[in-house]
A protein has these predicted regions:
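C-terminal interaction-tip segments
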Residues: 1-37, 105, 112-131
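Beta-sandwich interaction modules
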Residues: 91-106
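A short beta-strand element within beta-rich, extracytoplasmic domains
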Residues: 38-47, 108-111
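Beta-strand elements of well-folded, non-transmembrane domains
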Residues: 47, 62-64, 125-129
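Short structured motifs
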Residues: 25-28, 81-82, 95-97
Length: 131
């Protein structure tokens, strides 16, 4: 698994995705394809339940622990949480990320909610392709 060179991208395609989170806390939401980098610009979670709070878990699995050219990580982890058991009040919205996060080919975004159907996750992204 190589890191795509973002200087030589052949296309940049933006988009949005929405998920109604299940109570399977390790559900796969997306996997980054080969020769792609996913730039996540924003992640929000809205609690659509009018009376009860719900917790959200969101993490990236499959991260490379080898680093990239010019970086030698020490103690890098292949699984990292962006949010872990974070409470989202009823009828409220939580911003999980509002600055860019890059996911590389093979990285997997996973997550879920403490109550099935209570949380909607929205993300805005760009796919950078060097194929």
């Amino acid at each position: 698994m190589a890191n795509p060179n973002i200087v030589n991208v052949t296309s940049i395609v933006g988009g949005n995705l929405g998920f109604n989170l299940s109570n399977t806390l390790t559900a796969t939401l997306l996997t980054v394809d080969s020769d792609k980098i996913l730039k996540i610009n924003r992640i929000t979670v809205a609690n659509v339940d009018g009376s009860s709070a719900a917790n959200v878990d969101l993490f990236v699995d499959g991260l490379t622990t080898a680093g990239a050219t010019g970086i030698t990580p020490t103690g890098a982890d292949a699984t990292v949480y962006l949010a872990k058991t974070v409470s989202v009040p009823a009828d409220a919205t939580l911003v999980i990320a509002d600055t860019p996060i890059y996911l590389m080919e093979g990285d997997i975004l996973k997550g879920g909610a403490s109550a099935s159907g209570d949380l909607d996750l929205f993300l805005s992204y760009e796919v950078l392709d060097d194929a």
